[in-house]
Amino acid sequence: MGPEGKVEMLVGNYRGGRFNRPNDVICHSNGCIYFTDPDKRRPYDEREIPGPAGENNLWDGARVYRLAPDGGLSVLAPCEYPNGLALSPDERTLYVANTRSSQYIHAIKLDAAGHMVGRSIFADLNEGTEPGIPDGLKVDSIGRVYCTGPGGIWVIDPNGTLIGVIRWPEQAVNFAFGGPDLRTLFCCAHTSVYTLRVKVPGNPHPWYKLRGETT
């Protein structure tokens, strides 16, 4: 959106093929934009078949894309069912929530230009038995990863060790750090929005660095 309020399409296809259903997006301070494109929610007659872009010119989804500052689009990494995205405070790691059928958080290591140089499973949420899936994903200012999952919002330290689960009256779907000090957690659940004050603020959005702001 420009100063006049005009909305423009940033990217509408990959190599001539339509996206499946872009889901989440995050911006790096180097100008790269990352977004997820899951699959499996198209009409049956639009499911992929062998070919460069599948039936009805649809890609099969299940990818994390990287949009470079010059407009070049590439596949950063394939993923079973990529959903939420978050960047570590130093922006060297991109976290990806994998929703179905395996419930993981992937950690993608990035070089200075924002290309993938390594990848690993950061956390395994498959052992949870309560309602909830990896979807909303955020990082706080000391690098801890917050992710919706079975039972609530999972809080995981930078080494991948589970610290605990923040529980809510109903299933958590997505959330954000907000307020003047980024110490209020706003959580969207199935029927309501909840708030919780936390001791450690959320990590400021990377674009604040370009503007010389801290919150």
Walk through the language-model features, giving the residues of each.
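Conserved beta-strand positions in repeat-built beta-propeller and related beta-rich domains
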Residues: M1, I33-D39, L94-R100, R144-P150, ...
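Asp-box/WD-like beta-propeller blade repeats and closely related beta-sheet repeat scaffolds
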Residues: M1-A53, L58-G61
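Blade-edge beta-strand/turn elements of extracellular beta-propeller
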Residues: G2-G16, G61-Y81, K109-T129, I153-W168
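Beta-rich, blade/repeat-based domains predominating
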Residues: R15-I33, L58-R63, S74-T93, L125-P150, ...
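Structural signal for beta-propeller blades
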Residues: R41-P43, A62-V64, S102-I105, I153-W154, ...
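Predominantly five- to eight-bladed beta-propeller fold
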Residues: R47-R63, K199-T215
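Short loop/turn segments immediately following beta-strands, especially the blade-tip
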Residues: A107-H115, R197-H205
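A short, acidic, flexible beta-alpha connecting loop/helix-capping segment that sits on the rim
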Residues: E170-A172, D181, A189-Y194, K199-G202
